Amino acid sequence: MNIRTILVEKAIAAMTTVGLPADTNPAVTQSTRPQFGDYQINAAMGAAKKMKSNPRELAQKIIDNLDVSDIAEKTEIAGPGFINIHLKPEFLAQSVKAANSDAKLAVNEHANPQKVVVDYSSPNLAKEMHVGHLRSTIIGDAIVRALEFRGDSVVRQNHMGDWGTQFGMLIAHLEDQISQGVDLDTVALADLETFYRDAKKRFDDEEGFADKARNYVVKLQGGDAHCEKLWKLFIATSVKHSEEVYKRLNVTLTQADIMAESAYNAELNDIISLLKDKNIAVESQGAQVVFLDELANKDGEPSAFIVQKSGGGFLYATTDLAACDYRSNKLGADRILIFVDARQSLHFNQVELTARKAGFLRDETSYEFCPFGTMMGADNKPFKTRTGGTVKLADLLEESINRAAIKLAERESDLSEQERSEIARKVGIGAVKYADLSKHRTSDYIFNWDSMLSFEGATAPYLQYAYTRIRSIFRKSGVDAATLNSNVTIVEPQEKALALKLLQLEEVLDLMITEATPHVLCGYLYELASLYMTFYEACPVLKEGVEPNVRDSRLVLCNLVSKTLETGLDLLGIEVMEQM
């Protein structure tokens, strides 16, 4: 159900009857305060200005032709021409009952499902994932889950960095170990980070090692079988590390979703040939460059986008163009979403402009670069270890689980050690994810253990606790939530506020999907839980003296809140528990 969409359709019909232009935006919004109704139609002011008429008079004409008697108990004009819509409690009650009986909580699937390619996580292989990979991984996964929930066909693409000069460096270091008698089948790559660091130190400091590494890159790119065997060893080890992190994070990416850089190797020569044939790329100092006037600097100099090095080597740019061609022309994507650090904005602007010119992106394909900000430490600098090193993502998650266990140990509980451990895992992982996802995607944010693990405020532990409180009501009542289908009555203002919020889930998901911003769902779930707490204090459910029909009506509201929290948190990749 989408109340806003219903009102938009009714408002357009009324405005058409009044004679407003067909492209007039009805400007339907949720009201910010109950005294302004539940929704507002704000079209009259802008339309009246264009038509040089009185906005209140125009608003009255719209109301006179607005057929909302089935859902609204009152419409009124406020201020310069706002139309306030007060929804019928009966309409809300019937809609809540229907949503409670529906597996998808009355959230409709898209009328015209799209094929959406989502490029997310995409770590560089050869070393372990670090905290810098968190945002792309969990933001992208939340959007993927929401798209699938609404019925879109989603193609996950984990564009892992599995090619490039770093592999020549690693192969050279490994070859030296093998030459010293280390058995390739037993070589210790468990600590990839240490292996990479040792190889990098040799690359930077040891005479002759860098040349050796570059020679191995040439061999690898030339298809040398031995180099390829060693390369695959690094890839397999890296992928295994990544998969362990994905499982810990409760992320839906699997090995089948990997579409790494090397997957496009066979296409890169053709990409360059086409760019040259169409005079899109030209030679400059031996390299192939696309000059983009659309991104010219303040002096009018076009942006230079290098697609092939002077020595003939390919770059990220070449691979990204090949990925555009594959996703748009071969997969037939309607949308391509790419979740990458905001610092790569220029690069992806260059990619899209070049791909459009070359035909690698069809006009019908929406190419959406979805940048995100940085996780910062208390010093307002990118999050690091105390010694200034990179924080491994696996270590961060483990610490969060341990901290959650300590917090939970402070609470009285008769749960077993195994149950406590499982709850700590869900709380710890959920806390990290919600703390990140609840911030606007493009914003930097400061990482803070105390706030994210708090059981108060906008946190995962607070929402998880709210869910467990509702489940405990059903255990106490003896009512089977799965078969509960009582009639709902909306009398108290707290009941109405809660019912209205419950019925706005689809609107929230629409915004989240359109703008690729999970924080709107996070905010909605917190508002819902807060309204539930207010409702529960004001509207007794199981207290003595509550009429059975009132009790059952309120139990339906409680049940739908719990299902909405569970569904919403699941869309964020956060697990709930029956007890805490």
UniProtKB/Swiss-Prot annotation:
Q: Where is this motif: 'HIGH' region?
A: 123-133
Pfam families associated with the record: Arg_tRNA_synt_N, DALR_1, tRNA-synt_1d
Q: In the UniProt record, does the keyword Protein biosynthesis occur?
A: yes
BP GO annotations? arginyl-tRNA aminoacylation
Its EC number(s) = 6.1.1.19
Entry keywords, A to Z: Aminoacyl-tRNA synthetase, ATP-binding, Cytoplasm, Ligase, Nucleotide-binding, Protein biosynthesis
A GO molecular function annotation here is:
arginine-tRNA ligase activity
Instruction: Name the top EC class.
Output: ligase
Which reaction(s) does the protein catalyse, per the Swiss-Prot or TrEMBL entry?
Answer: tRNA(Arg) + L-arginine + ATP = L-arginyl-tRNA(Arg) + AMP + diphosphate
GO CC, sorted alphabetically, is: cytoplasm
The cellular location(s) given in this protein's UniProt record come to: Cytoplasm
Q: How does it assemble?
A: Monomer.
Protein family per UniProt: Belongs to the class-I aminoacyl-tRNA synthetase family.
Q: What is the protein named?
A: Arginine--tRNA ligase
**Species for this entry:** Pseudoalteromonas translucida (strain TAC 125)
Lineage per the UniProt record: Bacteria, Pseudomonadati, Pseudomonadota, Gammaproteobacteria, Alteromonadales
Q: Which gene encodes it?
A: argS
